[in-house]
From Swiss-Prot:
Belongs to the RNase H family. SUPFAM superfamilies: Ribonuclease H-like (SSF53098). It comes from the Bacteria. Endonuclease that specifically degrades the RNA of RNA-DNA hybrids. The gene is rnhA. Binds 1 Mg(2+) ion per subunit. May bind a second metal ion at a regulatory site, or after substrate binding. It is an enzyme of class 3 (hydrolase). This is Ribonuclease H. It catalyses: Endonucleolytic cleavage to 5'-phosphomonoester.
Length: 161
């Protein structure tokens, strides 16, 4: 991919996992920047798959703050296997905001606080949102999936202590 001068590419893969829905959940992030790979994961004891997918994207964009300042602007490509996240942030969020965070049938948007946070973070950067088919052999997505499951295990380990 050809980038304009003064722009650095950040490639991000995110995933969420949930054992039961609601149930124990985890999120995972694989971030690639300047030849370096950074990985993050976490989890919650009672959550949903959609909340974990959203939290993965939020944690990924928050992680951009910790990247070294190269004096160049960042172009972010975020890959998710969640159409809920990809379509939500690319298409639906604009209508939700116009309607006061209500859906087309006038119901409150689920996970509103997370959507607001993701919307705010995504406006700080030049983010392109991509949907990838999950569990289809895509290296970045497979890695994010493994990290999300590690997030679930981390919660189970805490419960066992």
């Amino acid at each position: 991919m050809q980038l304009e001068e003064g722009v650095k590419l950040v490639e991000i893969f995110t995933d969420g996992a949930c054992k039961g829905n609601p149930g124990i959940g985890g999120w995972g992030v694989c971030l690639k920047f300047d030849g370096e790979v950074r990985e993050f994961f976490g989890g919650e004891p009672v959550t949903t798959n959609n909340r974990m997918e959203l939290l993965a994207a939020i944690r990924a964009l928050q992680a951009l703050e910790s990247l070294p300042d190269t004096g160049q602007s960042l172009r972010v490509q975020l890959h998710t296997d969640s159409q809920y996240v990809q379509k939500g942030i690319s298409e639906w969020v604009h209508s939700w905001k116009k309607r006061g965070w209500l859906t087309a049938d006038k119901k409150p948007v689920k996970n509103e606080a997370l959507w607001k946070e993701l919307d705010q973070l995504s406006r700080r950067y030049q983010v392109e949102w991509f949907w990838v088919r999950g569990h289809n052999g895509h290296d970045g997505n497979e890695r994010a999936d493994m990290l999300a499951n590690r997030g679930v295990v981390s919660v189970l380990s805490e419960k066992a202590d």
